[in-house]
């Protein structure tokens, strides 16, 4: 191994309804990392939350990485600066691994919501993505929308609901000013658990579905007609924040909106347009708004900012601090269209993680 090779651990899988999306994203990232520059270790997280060494069961050609349920367990050491122990691989004593940077390719709860970021902070290791505050703020759509609204950024009218504090269809319609509603879990992505409701019966079923995935759900006004426009944001190692060319998602009429099935299980579920055909002045407004959103929510490293466009009106929909990197995912496609191919994007993300960690270690932690 060359002396200047960077040791990267890819975390994937996880205790989340987006476990399978994570496995596909991680495979794409694994293929994109230059083998001459990076020594990669694959760490799978089972649906039960167990960390396992996954190198032996995965190849760079895989379309989705495998999490071996009985693989050797990995334990990341607190304050270990990237040191980890491998348990149960047949060795007489625990084996030690060391990483320079960790790439958490984890979507949804227990990976994108600040919990993993907190663990990595305690491990004192460089990692890709937003820190605890940005991850948590962006993941909770209720909190994110309140912060964006307070900052003067446009959002779709919404109301929140929990099982302990239910909201009737009539009250929701009155609150958001529309009889056609979207219901979604507050802390989930990949369109998991999202439904559209136009009647009290549909509303009740939609709330029951969303509450299966989260204790808090969001009820939003349905904007129609609408264009779903996305923008990728990237922070470089020197702190410069840039916005990409825009992308547009056009769901098939059979789906009605960009559902989980339209994204991942139906090859004809949606058409993706990168770059999006948006009037230059409007496109510039959206890109500027994307970087503002990035700052308001304390994002770092990377984020995908999703917008609804209704005529000349632009609404911030949501922010993903660990966006998908599957073969169909928009974040890498938008940077590709901007002139940054995925291997160079990986370089930029890892460089940012290393530079940030070095800066943070220089801050005084004791008097």
UniProtKB/Swiss-Prot annotation:
Residues that coordinate or bind ATP: 174-229
PROSITE patterns assigned to the protein according to its UniProt record, in alphabetical order: ATP_GRASP, DALA_DALA_LIGASE_1, DALA_DALA_LIGASE_2
GO CC field: cytosol
Binding site for Mg(2+) 1: 306, 318
Co-factor binding comment: Binds 2 magnesium or manganese ions per subunit.
Superkingdom assignment: Bacteria
Cell compartments where the protein resides: Cytoplasm
Metabolic or biological pathway: Cell wall biogenesis; peptidoglycan biosynthesis
Catalytic activity: 2 D-alanine + ATP = D-alanyl-D-alanine + ADP + phosphate + H(+)
ATP-binding is among the record's keywords: yes
EC number, UniProt record: 6.3.2.4
Protein family: Belongs to the D-alanine--D-alanine ligase family.
Function comment: Cell wall formation.
Protein name as catalogued: D-alanine--D-alanine ligase
């Amino acid at each position: 191994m060359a002396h200047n090779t960077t040791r990267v651990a890819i975390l994937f899988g996880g205790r989340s309804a987006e476990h399978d999306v994570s496995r596909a994203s991680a495979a794409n990232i694994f293929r994109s990392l230059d083998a001459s520059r990076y020594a990669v270790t694959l760490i799978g997280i089972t649906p039960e939350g167990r960390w396992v060494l996954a190198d032996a069961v995965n190849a760079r050609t895989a379309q989705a990485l495998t999490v071996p349920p009985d693989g050797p367990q990995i334990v990341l050491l607190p304050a270990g600066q990237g040191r980890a122990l491998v348990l149960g691989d047949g060795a007489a004593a625990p084996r030690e691994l060391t990483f320079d940077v960790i790439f958490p390719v984890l979507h949804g709860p227990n990976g994108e919501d600040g919990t993993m970021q907190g663990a990595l902070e305690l491990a004192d290791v460089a990692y890709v993505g937003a820190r605890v505050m940005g991850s948590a703020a962006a993941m909770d759509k209720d909190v994110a929308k309140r912060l964006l609204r307070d900052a003067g950024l446009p959002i779709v009218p919404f109301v929140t609901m929990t099982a302990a504090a239910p909201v009737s269809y009539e009250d929701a319609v009155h609150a958001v000013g529309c009889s056609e509603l979207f219901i979604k879990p507050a802390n989930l992505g990949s369109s998991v658990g999202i439904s559209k409701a136009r009647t009290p019966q549909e509303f009740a079923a939609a709330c029951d579905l969303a509450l299966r995935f989260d204790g808090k759900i969001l009820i939003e006004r349905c904007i129609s007609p609408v264009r779903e426009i996305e923008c990728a944001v990237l922070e470089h190692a020197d702190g410069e924040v840039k916005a990409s060319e825009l992308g547009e998602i056009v769901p098939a009429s059979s789906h009605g909106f960009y559902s989980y099935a339209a994204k991942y299980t139906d090859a004809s579920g949606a058409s993706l347009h990168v770059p999006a055909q948006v009037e230059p002045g409007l496109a510039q407004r959206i890109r500027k708004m994307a970087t503002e959103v990035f700052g308001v929510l304390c994002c770092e490293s990377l984020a995908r900012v999703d917008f609804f466009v209704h005529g000349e009106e632009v609404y911030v929909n949501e922010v993903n601090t660990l966006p998908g990197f599957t073969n169909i995912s928009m974040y890498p496609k938008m940077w590709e269209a901007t002139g940054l191919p995925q291997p160079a994007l990986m370089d930029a993300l890892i460089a940012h993680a290393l530079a940030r960690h070095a800066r943070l270690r220089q801050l005084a932690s004791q008097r």
